Amino acid sequence: MCGQADLALLGIEMKVIFVRHGEPDYHELEERSYTGFGLDLAPLSEQGRRQAQELCQHPLLRSADLLVSSAMTRALETASYVACATGLPLRVEPLLHEWQVYQTGRGNFEKARSLFLENNGALLPSSPIQYETAEEMKARFVDCMAKYRDYQTVVLVAHRMLIRQFVPDRQIDFCQVIECEIEI
């Protein structure tokens, strides 16, 4: 069961078919010491490409009116497979990016993720690491998706932490498909 966005503007219900991107390959970027948003340039791994190809067989994808993707490379590459297989029009949305941690480094990301989960998405004043809260992510999502209210069903290729704000599962696998009704 998916959660309702508490930040509904007009209360228009939209079916969202969430898809987490395929497995990325950070190897080349890490070798060159890329950090922060630089790591978001990572393409899919070979396994991630296979996952995206298999994803294209999912019957729910063909029930959609539109395909919307995060602008981050791993999501956009996954969406390109879906667009080719389904013929759905593709829109790229930079505001559907990965959850933001305001200190760089993989260790900080994992520490922030643990704090986020422990604090149910809140940022405590004493937090040693600053990060985007659950409410901020939901607001960003609703602001971005408001322009698509005229569509009944949208496939959305995005990231685990963003998807988790509407789906109770802590673990969302690469290229997993989750159908939700969300008020936008």
Protein language model regions, located:
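N-terminal amphipathic/basic-hydrophobic helices that include classical n-h-c signal peptides
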Residues: M1-E13
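Flexible, charged surface loops at secondary-structure boundaries
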Residues: L10-I12, L60-S63, K147-Y151
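Active-site-proximal alpha-helix that buttresses catalytic centers in soluble enzyme cores
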Residues: K15-R91, Q176-I178
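Short, active-site-adjacent cap segments at secondary-structure transitions
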Residues: D25, A75-L76, W99-Q100, L162-R164
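Phosphate-handling substructures
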Residues: E28-L29, G38-P43, C84-R140
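Alpha-helical packing segments of well-folded alpha/beta enzyme cores
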Residues: Q51-L55, A75-T78, T133, M137-C144, ...
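Short, well-ordered beta-to-alpha junction loops that form the rim of enzyme active sites
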Residues: S69-T73, L95, V157-M161
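Active-site-adjacent alpha-helix immediately C-terminal to a catalytic or transition-state-stabilizing loop
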Residues: A139-I184
